């Protein structure tokens, strides 16, 4: 019955937040096996995991498990709506994590990976519904610690590569402002910032 299947799916997805890593890992593997056998269920399973990922009260371990699972989904042009919703969620979670000062974490890396995977299948991902999160990222790229600014720029770099010319120009202004500030010259490990500069120069 549909009700029983929905309840079972919710139960398995909730196990992604189990404090025992082996249990969370098994839940992720089980969900992937279900999708391997029934690929048409991808939007339904993804929606349940997204609801879990954005649920208040989840710890960072649970959130990382959910994002890691979503990063393994098979995406295509036929799943453009799903891809767009994933991009919007990744951007919102990334912005929230950076604002909370959670830098240099596996979660940020997983979110960047997710954006990279989903954007090619989500041509309309950067619509009006994502404007608030994108504006927040630009705000972070001009304020806070230098590490916060660079992490925000790293995501904006990926969004700008798939956005319009206006977004690209805005990103480049923010990048050059970061490079020109005094803090940039004091960094002992400027690799990420230098990589962003190299990518920007190569694209021009």
Predicted regions and their residues:
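Extended alpha-solenoid helical-repeat scaffolds
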Residues: 1-204
